[in-house]
């Protein structure tokens, strides 16, 4: 599990942040190194001093994004992993993240769609990102004492992925409301008895 944020020199972080944002919102092929340098407040020469090629920068951006995501989730669930409600909280977290990014989709999925043939390593990083999220679902289910935690975690991961894709297509949070309601049913099937308050919150979202 990626459970820390590595120390990065300030200029490296500025370049990674700028490039990650540009690649995510505009696509790899539409973003030039000049644009990245300008967005990072530096020069193209400096960018190349830190990253030998645009491809190397893309891979670094994906790894940077994955480490930051895992660090955020580790902190979010550090002291509250023994309630099935934490599983629903993961759905809430991803919905909030996508809203913040205006339902622009998943950076890993989008990069695989665009670059997996030209740069196969992006698929391996994306697979790792999806695997870590699935394993987190399984771990949360197991810590909560739910039945068949691995099966449940796999089912929830598919729900989460589907909601993410549909939210991009529909440009809406509606798929997450549906997924949250379906997740509640799955959790109940696997042994959770939610309180009336918890049921009310989920139905209200739905």
Model-identified regions with their sequence ranges:
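Amphipathic alpha-helical segments enriched in hydrophobic/aromatic and basic residues
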Residues: 23, 32-33, 44, 54, ...
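N-terminal intrinsically disordered/low-complexity leader segments
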Residues: 1-10, 191-206
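Amphipathic alpha-helical packing segments from all-alpha helical-bundle domains
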Residues: 70, 85, 118-143, 154, ...
């Amino acid at each position: 599990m990626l459970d820390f944020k590595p120390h990065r020199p300030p200029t490296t972080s500025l370049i990674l942040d700028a490039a990650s944002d540009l690649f995510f919102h505009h696509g790899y092929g539409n973003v030039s190194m000049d644009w990245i340098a300008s967005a990072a407040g530096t020069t193209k020469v400096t960018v190349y001093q830190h990253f030998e090629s645009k491809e190397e920068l893309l891979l670094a951006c994906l790894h940077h994004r994955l480490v930051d995501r895992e660090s955020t989730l580790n902190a979010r669930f550090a002291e509250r992993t023994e309630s099935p409600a934490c599983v629903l909280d993961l759905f809430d977290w991803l919905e909030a993240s996508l809203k913040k990014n205006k339902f622009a989709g998943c950076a890993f999925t989008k990069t695989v769609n665009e670059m997996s043939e030209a740069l196969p390593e992006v698929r391996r990083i994306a697979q790792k990102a999806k695997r870590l999220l699935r394993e987190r679902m399984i771990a949360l289910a197991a810590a909560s004492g739910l039945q068949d935690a691995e099966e449940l975690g796999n089912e929830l991961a598919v729900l989460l992925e589907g909601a993410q894709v549909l939210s991009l297509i529909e440009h809406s949070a509606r798929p997450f409301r549906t997924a949250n309601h379906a997740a509640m049913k799955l959790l109940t099937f696997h042994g959770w008895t939610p309180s009336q308050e918890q049921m009310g919150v989920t139905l209200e979202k739905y």
